[in-house]
């Protein structure tokens, strides 16, 4: 059998088919990032699996991709493709095996998990239709070179009876789900499957109380754990013996929802940045608009992490917002929850955040970051461990880095360039600060006072501001500037207008419309953070709850009221953390209030 990565032949369009003989690999080679297949900045999948080939075929021949999935059989539940040049979303229809709608060349062919395709299912590309058979191209099935000039891997029998088309596999223990075609025509197509609502229920459970969490159960010899303890003590929540479980189906639904919503947010971001009237709704200083658009054009694929806030229970799964410019929760999900499990958990479940730091390291390896990264954090004890967690990921990815606590160490050299206390040039930054903080500094300056963004290149007292770092053209900042668009709640009404009544969205508007009056609504400032300045209003116009904060003067949006569930007596918020969103979704942390 040819070793892993051997070229076996070509599919139509000159798309290469590679050997996926994992047994030929060094068993000690566990660098997951090395197995990620990219074309330019576009992630294709895990080398050299069937999903990677199918996505690469669509990308090279049609300029479209489907969203990332955990297993090949899950593709059959997707209902759109993304056009890579402009993030447009195109409809994708699924037709069951035995459908009156004939398969066609270029369509995806999907298998259920089981038999030869145990656990994973399978996907192939239909390359040719003949009278009583079809030809397909695929990866991870054949492991020998194709004959010269042959651009298909297998032929499958096609039976036409009573105007319906049925395909029969060459394996006798597999099930073909059907084929998927990019078309607006929904005749004979399947609706998107619903997950059983009971599968989304969050269950409460308790550990036996044996004093596992009395005293110093975190290891303060580890600098990262020590930083967490300095901020929070040896505390994970108010009751460390209480924990919560979700089903595997719910975990997969969260992954699917996060991937799908991320693409929807990108699609909406593209719409906003092409329309001045929409962009004006975000209250972003107009002097930044050209830079925003340039950031989107140049750095669309440079996002490392983000966080979506969901509500999940028997009613369904709804997204509240996308914290696309967020630096928090990595340590809690990727480390502290693991240490909690090691200390007291003896069940068969797993932490969905396990391996988070590996995913982050993989994202950094495929980023455009420069060899040395300055990690910029506020002078805040909680941000100490946020910064240290990311520094560990950068180190694992092979980057050198330095944490800057506050801005006091920075100054300008004689040429007006920014340098740190060691005299090192600052040209690549990962930050814990929100971009909104920098924009607040711009709002303090009259836009008519300067010809461009008011960035200092010197100061009598050497006082460096945040905008003097983040908005310097030569400084590469993660997360990119464009993430202020999906991270601003003004995008929520736009999302609703683009995808009305989508299963994961809540009705949201810039005014209280008739539907919101009937459902009740939440009043949220468009750039608010940490749950500040939110009002909850019932369908009887009764104020249910109200929070204070510093965002009271901001423009508001009005979002359909969708209250958090109570589980085991506590109000529960499930937070899905789509770290490394361009490659993988990872982590599910619980926040209990």
Which role does the model predict for each range below?
Residues 1-80:
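N-terminal capping segments
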Residues 118-190:
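Aromatic- and glycine-rich peptidoglycan recognition patches
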Residues 49-56, 104, 125, 175:
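Extracytoplasmic/secreted proteins, especially bacterial periplasmic and envelope-associated proteins
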Residues 108-110, 123-125, 177-178, 522, ...:
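Ordered hydrophobic segments in well-structured contexts
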Residues 187-593:
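Preference for protein termini
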Residues 76-143:
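...with weaker cross-activation on analogous glycine-rich loops/strands in unrelated enzymes
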Residues 72-83, 285-291:
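Amphipathic alpha-helical surface "interface" segments used
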């Amino acid at each position: 059998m040819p070793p892993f990565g051997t070229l076996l032949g070509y599919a139509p369009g000159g798309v290469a088919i590679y050997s996926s003989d994992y047994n030929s690999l060094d068993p000690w080679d566990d660098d997951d990032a090395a197995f990620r297949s990219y074309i330019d900045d576009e992630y294709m999948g895990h080398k050299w699996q069937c999903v990677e080939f199918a996505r690469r075929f669509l990308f090279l021949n049609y300029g479209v991709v489907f969203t990332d999935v955990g297993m090949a059989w899950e593709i059959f539940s997707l209902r759109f493709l993304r056009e890579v040049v402009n993030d447009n979303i195109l409809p994708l229809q699924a037709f069951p095996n035995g459908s009156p709608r004939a398969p066609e060349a270029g369509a995806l062919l999907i298998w259920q998990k089981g038999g030869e395709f145990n656990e994973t299912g399978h996907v192939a590309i239909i390359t040719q239709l003949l009278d009583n058979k079809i030809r397909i191209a695929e990866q991870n099935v054949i492991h020998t070179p194709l004959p010269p000039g042959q651009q298909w891997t297998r032929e499958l029998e096609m039976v036409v009876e009573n105007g319906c088309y049925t395909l029969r596999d060459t394996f006798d223990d597999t099930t073909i789900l059907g084929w998927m075609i990019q078309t607006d025509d929904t005749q004979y197509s399947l609706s998107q499957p619903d997950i059983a609502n009971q599968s989304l229920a969050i269950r409460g459970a308790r550990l036996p109380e044996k004093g596992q969490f009395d005293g110093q159960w975190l290891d303060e010899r580890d600098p990262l754990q020590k930083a967490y303890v300095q901020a929070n003590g040896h505390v994970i929540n108010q009751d460390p013996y209480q924990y919560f479980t979700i089903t595997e189906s719910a975990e997969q639904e969260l992954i699917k929802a996060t991937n799908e919503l991320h693409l929807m947010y990108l699609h909406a971001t593209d719409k906003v940045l092409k329309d001045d009237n929409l962009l004006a709704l975000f209250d972003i200083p107009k002097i930044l608009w050209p830079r925003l658009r340039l950031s989107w054009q140049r750095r669309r694929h440079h996002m490392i992490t983000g966080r979506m806030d969901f509500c999940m229970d028997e009613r369904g799964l709804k997204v509240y917002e996308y914290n696309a410019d967020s630096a928090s929760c990595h340590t809690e999900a990727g480390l502290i929850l693991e240490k909690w499990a090691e200390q007291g958990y003896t069940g068969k479940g797993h932490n969905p955040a396990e391996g988070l730091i590996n995913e982050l390291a993989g994202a950094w390896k495929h980023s455009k970051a420069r060899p040395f990264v300055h990690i910029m954090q506020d002078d805040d004890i909680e941000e100490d461990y946020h910064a240290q967690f990311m520094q560990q990921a950068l180190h694992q990815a092979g980057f050198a880095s330095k944490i800057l606590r506050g801005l006091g160490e920075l100054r300008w050299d004689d040429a007006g360039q920014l340098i740190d206390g060691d005299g090192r040039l600052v040209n690549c930054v990962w930050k814990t600060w929100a971009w909104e903080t920098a924009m607040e500094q711009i709002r303090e300056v009259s836009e008519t006072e300067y010809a461009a963004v008011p960035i200092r290149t010197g100061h009598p007292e050497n006082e460096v501001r945040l905008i003097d770092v983040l908005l310097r053209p030569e400084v590469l900042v993660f997360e990119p500037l464009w993430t202020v668009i999906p991270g601003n709640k003004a995008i929520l009404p736009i999302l609703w207008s683009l995808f009305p009544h989508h299963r994961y969205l809540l009705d949201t508007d810039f005014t209280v419309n008739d539907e919101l009056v009937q459902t009740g609504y939440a009043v949220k400032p468009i750039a608010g953070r940490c749950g500040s300045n939110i009002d909850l209003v019932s369908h009887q116009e009764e104020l249910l709850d109200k929070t204070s904060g510093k965002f009271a003067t901001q423009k508001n949006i009005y979002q359909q009221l969708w209250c958090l569930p109570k589980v085991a007596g506590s109000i529960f918020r499930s937070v899905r953390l789509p770290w490394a969103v361009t490659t993988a979704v990872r982590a599910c942390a619980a926040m209990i209030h």
